[in-house]
Design a protein with these regions (language model features):
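Membrane-interface amphipathic/juxtamembrane segments adjacent to transmembrane helices
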Residues: 30-45
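Typically the conserved alpha-helix immediately C-terminal to a functionally engaged Cys/Sec
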Residues: 60-74
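Thiol-based oxidoreductase modules, predominantly thioredoxin-like and allied folds used
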Residues: 75-89
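Structural micro-motif
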Residues: 96-104
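Non-catalytic, surface beta->alpha helical segment in thiol-disulfide oxidoreductase systems
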Residues: 105-138
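The canonical Cys-X-X-Cys-His
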Residues: 56-60, 103
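Short active-site neighborhood of thiol/selenol oxidoreductases, capturing the structured segment around
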Residues: 42-55
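N-terminal targeting signals for export/organelle localization
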Residues: 1-34
Length: 138
């Protein structure tokens, strides 16, 4: 009897997690197209908000290096802002961040254009910045 319950328990757990992620991502999708925080200092280019945490291994070993490599090839006016959710919990709540890492791409007006939950490669983020209005070098 116990052996029969294990697959059911596993299936219920997986289903519950899938539902949680769907609800979370659905809530964040509502933010696309909205301005939640005015662009800093008259920004002329898109920017990235990078939500991280002290204990987030993937944040430190993969996402941060990908963002640094991306930043090295970007125009100096593109801002990548690293936000520790323990230091700025209100900002994390405003953007409905529930998983780390999360990167949010904003256009020059501060409007949310893309939200990435989990690791986002430099290539993906560069494409999202271009879609948000970053000029492409000729």
């Amino acid at each position: 009897m116990i052996l029969l319950l294990e697959p059911l328990i596993a299936a219920a757990a997986i289903g519950g997690m899938a539902l949680f992620l769907r609800v979370q991502r659905g809530g964040q999708r509502e933010l696309v197209g909205r301005v939640l925080e005015p662009a800093s200092g008259g920004a002329q280019l898109p920017s990235i908000l990078y939500f991280t945490g002290e204990t987030c291994t993937i944040c430190h070993t993969a996402q941060r290096p990908a963002l640094r490599a991306l930043a090295a090839g970007l125009d100096a006016g593109v801002e990548i802002r690293e936000i520790d959710i323990a230091v700025e919990p209100e900002l994390a709540r405003r953007y409905r961040v529930m998983s780390l890492p999360t990167t949010i791409v904003l256009d020059a007006a501060g409007q949310v254009t893309d939200i990435n939950v989990g690791f986002a490669s430099g290539e993906v983020l560069r494409r999202q910045l271009v879609d948000a209005g970053m000029p492409v070098a000729a």
